[in-house]
Amino acid sequence: MLRKGDVNRVANAYWCVVAGSEIWLVDGAVPFGSAEQFSLPEENARQIGDYLGSPVMWINFADLEQDLPLVSLRDCLHFPEPLFMLLSKAIQYGHMTQSLRFCPQCGGRNFLNNNQFAMQCGECRTLHYPRIFPCIIVAVRKENQILLAQHPRHRNGMYTVIAGFLEAGETLEDCVAREVHEETGIHVKNIRYFGSQPWAFPSSMMMAFLADYDSGELNPDYTELSDAQWFGVKEMPPVAPTGTIARALIEQTISDILSD
């Protein structure tokens, strides 16, 4: 962990300047060099990891005196996974500083703790860590078809797999079954874990599953979805982009179908 006073010893680093779910890039890449080179306030920087042997530093855009062009984190999905994960971490820490400005315990003003990535109340000294929202995401297979859905926010016609937030007192497997049934009307079986991905929009943790169709007729909930259909591997619509765990689930399901 890099403390505030240690930052001056960083010669060259990757600099993650973040605001909301946006990040600063230079010529399409995370800027690499010294803080002085980019006129960045290194006293406000924190190290969040290392990439290719160099430190990765996080700074909030609000701490800058200069205006910088920002792009969505989604535009970085093609970056190498270790780097994208660090950018996601920077986004989530930035969101922490904005969403936890005041202490939920006593209402006092929170400040960034110098020894760990948490906000700390200046009055009661309570530590508040980044809020992470657990979500499931699942690819459902029915014989040689995969279930894909379209959401109203997908303006480009993109289809993806079913996802939703975990409820209190619910297992991940129960959440998978509930979300699929609520959004599409079908029941699933053979629910099995696939992997996970931090999803900093703004602070979700996507826990991915594969499942098989069990019973029921497809009946989309049009308050949640624009469409839901079974697709064969040769009739796939535009799907979630490479770099997302949704795309990984789709590719795994297609691979499983083709290998049977």
Swiss-Prot record:
One of its GO terms (biological process) is NADP catabolic process. Gene3D superfamilies: 3.90.79.20, Nucleoside Triphosphate Pyrophosphohydrolase. GO terms for molecular function: magnesium ion binding; manganese ion binding; NAD+ diphosphatase activity; NADH pyrophosphatase activity; RNA NAD-cap (NMN-forming) hydrolase activity; zinc ion binding. Its cofactor is Mg(2+); Mn(2+); Zn(2+). Substrate binds at R74, Y129, Q197, P198, W199, A200, F201, P202, S203, S204, A246. It catalyses: a 5'-end NAD(+)-phospho-ribonucleoside in mRNA + H2O = a 5'-end phospho-adenosine-phospho-ribonucleoside in mRNA + beta-nicotinamide D-ribonucleotide + 2 H(+); NAD(+) + H2O = beta-nicotinamide D-ribonucleotide + AMP + 2 H(+); NADH + H2O = reduced beta-nicotinamide D-ribonucleotide + AMP + 2 H(+). Its EC number is 3.6.1.-, 3.6.1.22. It is an enzyme of class 3 (hydrolase). A motif (Nudix box) lies at residues 164-185. A divalent metal cation 1 binds at A163, E183, E224. Belongs to the Nudix hydrolase family. NudC subfamily. Homodimer. This is NAD-capped RNA hydrolase NudC. The gene is nudC.
